[in-house]
Amino acid sequence: MERQRRFMSEKDEYQFQHQGAVELLVFNFLLILTILTIWLFKNHRFRFLHETGGAMVYGLIMGLILRYATAPTDIESGTVYDCGKLAFSPSTLLINITDQVYEYKYKREISQHNINPHLGNAILEKMTFDPEIFFNVLLPPIIFHAGYSLKKRHFFQNLGSILTYAFLGTAISCIVIGLIMYGFVKAMVYAGQLKNGDFHFTDCLFFGSLMSATDPVTVLAIFHELHVDPDLYTLLFGESVLNDAVAIVLTYSISIYSPKENPNAFDAAAFFQSVGNFLGIFAGSFAMGSAYAVVTALLTKFTKLCEFPMLETGLFFLLSWSAFLSAEAAGLTGIVAVLFCGVTQAHYTYNNLSLDSKMRTKQLFEFMNFLAENVIFCYMGLALFTFQNHIFNALFILGAFLAIFVARACNIYPLSFLLNLGRKHKIPWNFQHMMMFSGLRGAIAFALAIRDTESQPKQMMFSTTLLLVFFTVWVFGGGTTPMLTWLQIRVGVDLDEDLKERPSSHQEANNLEKSTTKTESAWLFRMWYGFDHKYLKPILTHSGPPLTTTLPEWCGPISRLLTSPQAYGEQLKEDDAECIVNQDELAMNYQEQAASPCSPPTRLGLDQKAAPQTPGKENIYEGDLGLGGYELKLEQTPGQSQLN
């Protein structure tokens, strides 16, 4: 009897390991297919279906196979046993079965209407990820890469517009979607499709907050390939990066909104408490991420880690990851922390790294971002069939489609009108139309929706979110190139040539009476540049003027301690260096790169310019169109473009 029991236990353990291997193998094959498809698309210059859309297609096919080609394997999984002596759910439970004690761990709470779907298919159950995997493993590399690869010159030049779209625009989208969905919910109650009280207004606002998270990864990838006008790219990229962080904190704030009396009534105290939570969590997460980046910058500045690039890269990665984990452990939002950690690391720490570490960190996070994004989009396709508690309601889905388009319009057009009143460099109508078109939903909305699927309203939200992501990625992502052509938006813009048309921030700071900036945030940019140039850069990096020349005399000992020896022989370049440089720039030792003690002495002088590279025919079709000012025209041959 004992031998049989041990045999059954070993068999169950082996079966569990087998299912885990099958799960990893499925995702491995999906990623292999996705990579081969990406190569095929790039080789044939096919832009009407992005790699994320292809990953979703493969996920759908695999989910369809798993759903209908696998048989039920676990009959006992849906059986409910009563434990009358337990008044709460313990984290671990020891159960004595025929004189053998087994340990079980708490997994999640299951509603009464979700018990029946648990009868049966263990493979489908295994293929349903723990939602925390998305937030703790897959999303941090994506968000960090967004901050680390930020082109800060254009970002700061459009800072006011980006903040307006990200904060005020997200709030507008949340409220508009919530109001429209509340109207449709009332119609569903009137039609008998919902019971009165199943869906509260706070649930509609919760859905509005998660659907306000835009993720135009498909559009931005095509923009990058075609070298679209940098202002449009920066506005859309900056909005999407900050919008993700705002939407996550906003979703959490709405979820903890709890009026004392009626959950469907407005409570001023609970409302202001939620607003306070939003501001406190966002500010705390920002401070946490920035603090870890400052610590990393100081460590890389005052140690000789640059002599050991492997150790330097490892420390950089672990401290960046610690920003996320520390924020989560402190009850803050790790996604916001890791975003601003990436931005600050790019601005300061990157300048202290050796050339090897610069290349390694850039490639490491670019690779992690690529894998994480494709795993999420593959899983989206899988989840349509492997998730066993879908609730599809035609009226709710119709309302959601209408709501996201109306909310996007209420976000972009009124805010652009207000911003243009104060901007010298206006946001043209074709930019506004493109931003309206680019309001795709993606990884963030999906991750927020799947985090809680226990109640029927949350299951309906999750199922609807999946359909919205599929539609926007396939339709809007695939229509990006034709839309650029129709709106006559510049492509092939050389960033360096575009920047020559605008005065640098340093020149603006020295010639305030002579010239007026073309950017709406110039005064803020000048103030920040001056403070950063005189104090922060010299403290945290090897560049900038010596602190002995900028701090008061009584700070002499501290100034000498914090000033790098390289600062006495180096002057900060007139134009602030870009955060991330590409391989060609690293190869020629980019002229605006800050001093690093481990960098080779060879560098371009201040008055030297790299020879311009004339793009060949292949590069033109790939999107590297040279000098810019062109309009994209579609040829008769699909997937190709010509220049005007």
Swiss-Prot record:
It is found in: Late endosome membrane; Early endosome membrane; Recycling endosome membrane; Cell membrane. Residues 593-622 are annotated as: Disordered. It holds the Pfam family Na_H_Exchanger. GO terms for cellular component: early endosome membrane; early phagosome; late endosome membrane; phagocytic vesicle membrane; plasma membrane; recycling endosome; recycling endosome membrane. Residues 1-20, 67-126, 186-203, 257-277, 386, 451-465 are lumenal. It is a multi-pass membrane protein. One of its GO terms (molecular function) is sodium:proton antiporter activity. Disulfide bonds: none annotated. The chain crosses the membrane at residues 21-41, 46-66, 127-147, 165-185, 204-224, 236-256, 278-298, 302-322, 323-343, 365-385, 387-407, 430-450, 466-486. InterPro entries: Cation/H_exchanger_CPA1, Cation/H_exchanger_TM, NaH_exchanger, NHE-6/7/9. One of its GO terms (biological process) is sodium ion transmembrane transport. It comes from the Eukaryota. Gene3D superfamilies: 6.10.140.1330. Keywords: Antiport, Cell membrane, Cytoplasmic vesicle, Endosome, Ion transport, Membrane, Sodium, Sodium transport, Transmembrane, Transmembrane helix, Transport. The keyword Cell membrane applies. Residues 42-45, 148-164, 225-235, 299-301, 344-364, 408-429, 487-644 are cytoplasmic. Belongs to the monovalent cation:proton antiporter 1 (CPA1) transporter (TC 2.A.36) family. Homodimer; phosphatidylinositol-4,5-bisphosphate (PIP2) and phosphatidylinositol 3,4,5-trisphosphate (PIP3) could be involved in the dimer stabilization. Interacts (via the C-terminus) with RACK1. Interacts with CHP1. PANTHER family: SODIUM/HYDROGEN EXCHANGER, SODIUM_HYDROGEN EXCHANGER 9. Endosomal Na(+), K(+)/H(+) antiporter. Mediates the electroneutral exchange of endosomal luminal H(+) for a cytosolic Na(+) or K(+). By facilitating proton efflux, SLC9A9 counteracts the acidity generated by vacuolar (V)-ATPase, thereby limiting luminal acidification. Regulates organellar pH and consequently, endosome maturation and endocytic trafficking of plasma membrane receptors and neurotransporters. Promotes the recycling of transferrin receptors back to the cell surface to facilitate additional iron uptake in the brain. NCBIfam families: b_cpa1. This is Sodium/hydrogen exchanger 9. It comes from Equus caballus (Horse). The gene is SLC9A9.
